[in-house]
């Protein structure tokens, strides 16, 4: 049934009239450019296409292992949790709730869904579309509430599993309140390393701009810290980055309102960083002008602050530098080859290992081998890591696993592996039907 629902819903979302409706609805509540909002609709549609036909059935593929005697065999099953909850943030009003909701349903659960109330109209409309495509109305409960009310509901209803996507603060609170019966997709302080091989400067500057500033930096995968190898100092990468950032404008929402930080709080953060010795403002650092964005939201120009590497790793600065600012903001630093171990130490100390990019086509730089201690991939743990010249931190489509690593509570989104991991548990049924051998006698007690 869910294969059929997915096929119909994928078809509906492929109709220009419908995809345009959802794109514009997303834009109304989560300010981003048309292209970025459309990206959500597109990924959602492709995800639904992936689970048409028998693909939902195949998600629950089981296996059997021969037993010790005739009639015995063990079967491993992916088993649903039953009553589950899904909590999702404001920044992806369609993609995150649809992908997680359908994953929960595909694996046979009964979910209650709570989307951030600022943006939940998008999912309300999408549920109507899904009902129209055959989703039985009793299969999903949809609640609109604030966080406090949802917290109470979870504690009273006691779902067997809750999937939380949002800030680390709420994630940790819920992990305690729900006694660990939770999977998390929480904050990202995502980094990118430009390796020693300098090439394709324009392309790499463009990807950096998109990663840091698209959706005004309000993606959990947004580039927050950029490490640039000293070989790039001969290039005009920074000035290109500045030019690209300055192209962004409020009129088309290529930069726009920040929903969870005010202008003052972001500028105060910039000023605190500028007190660190050797740091400097590369560009931005000013409020947006000529707008009517209410002051409870933030509105700043795309901003980059340079902080020297040796200052970043100092105890007193580290926490400040690695604070997630959910807005158009990034830290930039540089490093020499001999300083790679310091870079790796800075990455290791981060608490949220979500996305990362290692921009290099030098395989020895990318890979770690046990006798080379300072290479990147083998020394880091981020769940979604892009490696190679075209590496990015954002843009993970439905065909890439997206989620943190290194935390047993870490969830994933999008792929069959993510769905099976998050929305089902392993159950083994050992069939042992006999026959009991004809000559069997009661053995001595053991
Ligand atoms: N890892 C990921 O996949 C991912 C994806 C998107 C966003 N994020 C993170 O989300 C954050 C931004 O989103 P946000 O500001 O909406 O996050 P948030 O934590 O404030 O809210 C997330 C959701 O939790 C609800 N909530 C808040 N308090 C709650 C409580 N006590 N009990 C139950 N529910 C509660 C909110 O109403 C909302 O629906 C950033 O930190 C970002 O990195 C992570």
Residue ranges and their predicted role:
Residues 27, 58-204:
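Rossmann-like NAD(P) dinucleotide-binding subdomain of oxidoreductase/dehydrogenase enzymes
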Residues 34, 74, 116, 143, ...:
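Hydrophobic alpha-helical scaffolding
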Residues 92-94, 119-120, 149-151, 170-171, ...:
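Flexible loop/turn segments at secondary-structure boundaries
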Residues 132-134, 157, 169-316, 338-341, ...:
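ALDH superfamily catalytic-core signature
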Residues 79, 99, 137, 177, ...:
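Short, solvent-exposed loop/turn segments at the edges of secondary structure
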Residues 1-73, 116:
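N-terminal Rossmann-like NAD(P)+-binding subdomain of aldehyde/semialdehyde dehydrogenases
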Residues 48, 123-126, 153, 174, ...:
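Hydrophobic packing residues within well-ordered alpha-helices of enzyme cores
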């Amino acid at each position: 049934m869910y294969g059929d629902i997915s096929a119909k819903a994928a078809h509906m979302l492929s109709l220009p009239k419908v995809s345009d409706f959802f794109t514009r609805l997303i834009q109304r509540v989560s300010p981003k450019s048309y292209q970025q909002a459309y990206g959500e609709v597109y990924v959602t549609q492709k995800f639904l296409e992936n689970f048409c036909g028998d693909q939902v059935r195949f998600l629950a593929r089981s296996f059997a292992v021969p037993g010790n005697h005739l009639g015995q065999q063990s079967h491993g099953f992916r088993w649903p949790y039953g009553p589950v909850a899904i909590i999702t943030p404001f920044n992806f009003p369609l993609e995150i709730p649809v992908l997680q909701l359908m994953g929960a349903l595909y694996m046979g659960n009964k979910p209650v869904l709570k989307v951030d109330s600022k943006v939940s109209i998008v999912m309300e409309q999408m549920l109507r579309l899904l009902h129209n495509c055959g989703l039985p109305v009793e299969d999903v409960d949809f609640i609109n509430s604030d966080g406090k009310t949802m917290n109470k509901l979870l504690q009273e209803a006691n779902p067997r599993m809750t999937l939380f996507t949002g800030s680390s603060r709420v994630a940790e609170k819920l992990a305690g309140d729900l006694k660990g019966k939770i999977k998390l997709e929480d904050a990202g302080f995502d980094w990118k390393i430009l390796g020693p091989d300098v090439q394709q400067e324009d392309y790499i500057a463009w990807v950096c701009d998109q990663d840091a500033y698209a959706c005004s930096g309000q993606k959990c995968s947004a580039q927050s810290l950029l490490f640039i190898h000293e070989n790039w100092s001969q290039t005009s990468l920074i000035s290109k980055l500045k030019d690209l950032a300055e192209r962004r404008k409020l009129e088309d929402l290529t930069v726009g309102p920040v929903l969870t930080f005010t202008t003052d709080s972001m500028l105060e953060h910039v000023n605190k960083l500028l007190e660190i010795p050797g740091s400097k403002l590369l560009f931005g650092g000013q409020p947006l002008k000529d707008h009517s964005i209410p002051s409870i939201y933030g509105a700043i120009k795309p901003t980059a602050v340079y902080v020297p590497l040796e200052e970043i790793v100092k105890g007193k600065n580290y926490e400040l530098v690695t604070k997630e600012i959910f807005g158009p903001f990034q830290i930039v630093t540089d490093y020499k080859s001999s300083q790679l171990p310091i870079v790796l130490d800075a990455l290791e100390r981060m608490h949220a290992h979500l996305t990362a990019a290692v921009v290099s086509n030098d395989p020895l730089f990318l890979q770690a081998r046990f006798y080379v201690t300072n290479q990147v991939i083998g020394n880091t743990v981020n769940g979604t890591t892009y490696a190679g010249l075209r590496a990015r931190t954002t843009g993970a489509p439905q065909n890439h696993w997206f989620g943190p690593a290194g935390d047993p509570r870490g969830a994933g989104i999008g792929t069959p592996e993510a769905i099976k991991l998050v929305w089902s548990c392993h159950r083994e049924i050992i069939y042992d039907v006999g026959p009991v051998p004809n000559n069997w006698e009661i053995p001595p007690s053991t």
